[in-house]
Structure formats: C-alpha cells, structure tokens
Regions:
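C-terminal structural segments of small proteins and small subunits
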Residues: 57-86
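Short edge beta-strands and adjacent turn/loop segments
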Residues: 16-37
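Short, flexible active-site-adjacent loop segments at beta-strand->alpha-helix junctions, enriched
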Residues: 24, 45, 78-80
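Solvent-exposed beta-strand sheet faces enriched in polar/charged residues
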Residues: 21, 40-42, 73-77
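Short amphipathic alpha-helices in soluble, non-transmembrane regions
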Residues: 9, 52-58
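Secondary-structure boundary/capping motif
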Residues: 31, 49-50, 78
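N-proximal, solvent-exposed amphipathic alpha-helical segments enriched in charged/polar residues
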Residues: 1-21
Length: 86
C-alpha cells in the first residue's frame, strides 16, 4: 500500500519531498493493514493553491486507493514553505 501511495503521488504531483508514515499501529483494530497514513508532500505544484485545493490535488492522485485507507492526514507545503519550517 505504501509503495502504491508513493507511486500515485509521484506520478501526479512533482514532489520535491515526500514522506509517507504508516500510523496504523497507533490505532487499535486495524492490525495487519495500512489503514491510517500521514502524508507530507512538498511541491511547487501547490504554489498559489489554498489548503483545500492542495488536499484535493492529493486526493485526486490517490483516488483509486482512498477507499482502501481508513484515515489520511495531509501536510501539503510549497518548497519555500517547507524551507521555512525545516
């Protein structure tokens, strides 16, 4: 699942930085599957987009996988925004 998420995001968004964190072990009742993920996506594709539009871009890239994931947390930053927090 993690590799599929990475592949879909990389094919649809020009990612300068991409982290996918499987947070499933922190949530009971979901053992053995990737059910909760945190995505940190850094891309200039987000430049000029508000938070909702950024998340829509991420969800569109994952549209064929969303039904298999219980919860997705998204951090979406432009390269300049990311430089300001790292």
């Amino acid at each position: 699942m993690i590799e599929n998420i990475k592949k879909n995001l990389s094919q649809n968004i020009k990612c300068n930085h991409l982290e996918i964190v499987d947070e499933s072990p922190n949530h009971g009742g979901y053992s053995g599957s990737v059910s909760h993920v945190k995505l940190i996506v850094v891309s200039d594709d987000f430049d000029g987009l508000n938070l909702i539009k950024r998340h829509q871009l991420v969800y569109k890239a994952l549209e064929n996988l969303v039904s298999e994931i219980h919860a997705i947390s998204i951090v979406s930053k432009t390269v300049d925004e990311w430089k300001g927090i790292t």
